[in-house]
Each structure stands twice: as C-alpha cells, then as structure tokens.
Amino acid sequence: QTESFSYESEIKSVLDIILLPTYKNYEKSYSSPFSSNLYSKETIILENNIERRVYPKLLYKGNHNKYASDNTANILLTFIISLLKYFFVFSIFYIFFYFRIIFKSKNNIFTPFKLNKVFLMTLSIIVILSIFLYELSLQYYVLGTDKVGVDVLYKSIKSIRTGILIGTLTTIVMLPFAIFLGIFAGYIGGFVDDVIQYIYTTLNSIPSVLLIASAILMLQVYMANNPLNFENIYERADLRLFFLCMILGLTSWTGLCRLLRGESMKLREVEYVQASKTFGLNRFSIIVRHIMPNIMHIVIITIVLDFSALVLAEAVLSYVNIGVDPTTYSWGNMINAARLEMSKEPIV
C-alpha cells in the first residue's frame, strides 16, 4: 500500500509556538481593547420571536477571567501573579549567572546588582511587562480585534519581527559597500576616489522611493508571469521580502560611505599611519590595523540611527503597496488594511 502525505506550507517559528494561545481562535469582527463584546450590533431572535439589536459577547476571550470576575480585580491579580513568576525566574538566573560573585568573600547577594544596576533594572522592566502582557493576552484582547477577528496584539508583535528582520538584513547588505568603498575612496584617493564618488552621487540623485517602487513592480510582473516557479504564497512573500531588503541595502549605503571616506582621508595623514608607510607596511595591512578600527565608532552610530529609519521605510512602502507581500504581517500592511475603514468607522 502507498501512503500519501500532505505537508503544511506555513512555517511555524518559535515565536508562533509561544504566541499560539493568543491567536489560534478568531472572533467575528472588530472589538475594543479589553472588551467582552463585539464592536458592532447584531440582530438576535428571543424565545417569543422578538428581534433585538445587541452587542454579541466574544467567544474566546473577554468573558473568561482567570482570577476574579471583576475586570479590574482580575487585571490587578494578573499583574501580581506576573511579578511572582518574574521573581521566581529572576532569582534562578541571578544566582546561576552571578554565583561566583555572590559567594566570593566579602560579597553579599546584592553585590552583582550594584555592579550592573542599570542593565538589570532595564531587563527587569522589560521581562515584567512581557510576562504581564502575555498573561493578559490569554484572557483579553489587549488591543482588540481587527475586521476578521484576529488579535491585533499578535499582529503587532509579528510586525515587530518583520521590521527587525528588514532592518537587520538591509544593514548586512549595506555595510560591505559602505565600509570598503568608503575606506578605498578616502585612503587610496585619486582615480578610485573619483569613481566611487561618481557612483554614490549618481545613486543619491535618483529618488529612492521611485527606485524601490520600480524594482518591486518588476518583481511583481515576474511573479505574475511565472506562477509555477512558486509552490505557495509563502515562497512569493519570502522572495518579495528578500528583494525589498536587497533594494533598500543597495540604496542606503551612500550616506555612511561618504562619512567613512572623509574619516579615512583624515586618518591617512596621522603620524602612526605615515610611520607605518615609512616602515614598508602594505596598504591592506594599514587599512586592517589602523583605518578600520578607528572608523568603527562611526559605523556603529550610523547603524543605530538608521535602523529605525529602515523600519519606517518598510511601513511607508507597505502602506503604498510596494513593500512586503500583503500576506506578511507588518505595520504598513496593518495601516493599509485599515485605511478604508478609517472613513467608515473612524473610532475603530
């Protein structure tokens, strides 16, 4: 006998497994945050055939409090339970990571906290809020539901992952161009400097939004003309996401390249670089030993400042339908999906 197997095309990540209780069931339509009823009224027929317009109760959350029947008391108890869970987990990790410091002579249990006060306090606030939010999301729709009854909090968290993924991949694509071309232009100079300046000046003269839009539209035409090359919608979405990261990376390296060029031109004139040339050190060794370590502060600062701009660019591009695939969770797609509803139901 031959057996046939069918495989699910959607890939489940660790985040999906963790958040499974928050999104496995869908409501009918919109609902407000922490509400126990749908946002829109429906007609129901009573026992004596009398029709009445009421707000239907939510099926899965909002009416199943875990600790108390009153919502305020239940939320307060949920916060207390979250604190207890946090202190239990924190005490285990605290002792595990700082065992040697705690039990060292002349130290007490609070010594590691004094040494890492800011880090531990910041981490504690993030973890407490995460546990509290997760506990609440099992009982309520913290941010309500959308038009088809999906938990908005779940979509928002998935959208954060999409934004971070785009920012990270775009940075990985952009860094090699910016670092190497910037250093070569500034340190070597001459004809190489002229060519690199011409390249990034030309790229800067092209509006980035139009360039990205044209590239994405070309990709859409290719996918429409070759549907058999993609087994499912997730392959199409992944290709579009990857292509968007490539385009953003190829158009966002020019600013950092210009900064590194100027810094490299300054560093090549300092005494220790001139001394290295005098002792016969080749260009590659000088760049690796002296130039690159002294420009990394500019690279780190630029990456941190531009990361949020890349996430915002994804949201803007998705809003005008030239960003990630509509099936991908992102802030731009969420705003775009709710755009028509803004004129119909502004309060939503």
Regions found by a protein language model. Name each.
Residues 1-170, 174, 334, 338-348:
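Gly/Trp-centered helix-boundary motif
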Residues 119-123, 145-348:
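Alpha-helical transmembrane segments of integral membrane proteins
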